[in-house]
């Protein structure tokens, strides 16, 4: 926290900087954490320079951005932004513990989460530094980039229910194999996504559980994830609709009942033009070169924070574009440039007229 040091009309408002401190299973050390540490270092540098900002600066460290323990993403940032659906608190983890119970065990009060939200009029904007999680910056030989928008995203959970049976006694023509239906759906999802290159459409099935899960038993149930993303809401929605139609056809043909549950649907979150300009100027001051703009295919806390305020993001080059992996890596030099760019961005926001 850096309190405002100069009087003026924005003295009672604050600029928010942050990211998340959770990550996926078997991941790296930079996804999310970099943005929190960069914000802390930026505060130190501003204080070292003796810069008096006309607004407060607050660093946020979000939890539950990834949706690993619970089937819901952006829980902390949605709380701060005042857009958390209270029914989410009843979701349970693999051990049956609801979110509200976990919060209570941690010392929180799930019945008063609404009081944690910022008021829109109190916030100037939200900035986040994050590794790119893709290969573009590295391929162009550039350390930093300006995020133009965060892609439209949908997450779904599918349950295929067939009929379990003996692997050796049920003829192939009489089977209702839930896993075989799921496998066909996976290939169908891939086919649909490959046709959406112009819309930056991607779709992934990354998790599947089969029951009863024995080598000599025909699978009676398969529960699996589906992640669909695109550069536009229309493209993502159209792909999801086509997947639903094809899933119905597969289920009918195979005699398998397939349900689709929507876990999350988030529209494109566009960065505010005035923040993009401030970030571009900050990056140019730090690197000496004009930065490029990039669409973020990965989801970020900005998708929730845009419900509260304008958002802007700085992307940092990562090796080979690898993320959500222990091989995830960013160099000290690039991270240092990101901190410099963040400082320069904050200075330009303090000097400028703000939202335009």
Region spans (language model):
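Acidic/His- and Gly-rich active-site-bordering loop/insert found
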Residues: 1-28
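Alpha-helical metal-binding/catalytic segments enriched in His/Glu/Asp
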Residues: 17-20, 26-66, 154-160, 169-192, ...
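Zn-dependent metallopeptidase/amidohydrolase metal-coordination segment
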Residues: 18-19, 220, 290-341, 349
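Flexible, glycine/charged-enriched surface loops at secondary-structure junctions
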Residues: 52-56, 113-117, 169, 191-205, ...
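His/Asp/Glu-rich mid-to-C-terminal helical/loop segments that flank catalytic regions of hydrolases
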Residues: 148-150, 166, 170-195, 235, ...
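A short beta-alpha structural unit
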Residues: 204-213, 225-232, 257-276, 297, ...
């Amino acid at each position: 926290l850096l309190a405002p040091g100069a009087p003026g009309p924005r003295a009672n408002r604050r600029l928010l900087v942050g990211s998340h401190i959770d990550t996926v299973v078997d991941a790296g050390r930079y996804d999310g954490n970099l943005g929190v540490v960069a914000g802390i270092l930026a505060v130190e540098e501003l204080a070292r320079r003796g810069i008096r900002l006309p607004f407060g600066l607050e660093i946020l460290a979000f939890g539950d951005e990834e949706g690993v323990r619970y089937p819901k993403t952006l829980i902390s940032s949605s709380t701060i932004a005042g857009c958390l659906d209270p029914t989410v608190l009843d979701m349970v983890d693999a051990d049956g513990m609801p979110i509200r119970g976990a919060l209570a065990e941690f010392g929180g009060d799930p019945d008063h989460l609404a009081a944690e939200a910022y008021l829109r009029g109190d916030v100037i904007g939200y900035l986040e530094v994050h590794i790119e999680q893709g290969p573009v910056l590295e391929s162009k030989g550039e350390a930093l980039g300006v995020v133009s928008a965060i892609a439209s995203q949908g997450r779904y959970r599918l349950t295929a229910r067939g009929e379990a049976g003996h692997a050796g006694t049920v003829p192939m023509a009489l089977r209702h194999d839930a896993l075989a239906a799921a496998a066909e759906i996976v290939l169908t999802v891939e086919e649909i996504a490959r046709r959406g290159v112009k819309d930056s459409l991607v779709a992934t099935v990354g998790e599947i559980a089969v029951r009863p899960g024995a080598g000599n038993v025909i699978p009676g149930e398969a529960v699996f994830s589906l992640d669909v993303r695109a550069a536009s809401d229309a493209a993502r929605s159209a792909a999801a609709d086509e997947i639903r139609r094809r899933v119905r056809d597969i289920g009918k043909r195979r005699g398998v009942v397939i349900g689709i549950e929507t876990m999350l649907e988030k529209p494109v979150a566009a960065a505010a033009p005035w923040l993009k300009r401030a970030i571009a100027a900050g990056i140019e001051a730090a690197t000496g070169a004009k930065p490029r703009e990039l669409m973020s295919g990965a989801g970020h806390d900005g998708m929730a924070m845009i419900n509260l305020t304008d958002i802007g993001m700085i992307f940092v080059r990562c090796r080979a574009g690898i993320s959500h992996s222990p091989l995830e890596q960013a160099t000290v030099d690039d991270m240092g440039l990101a901190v410099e760019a963040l400082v320069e961005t904050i200075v330009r926001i303090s000097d400028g007229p703000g939202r335009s």
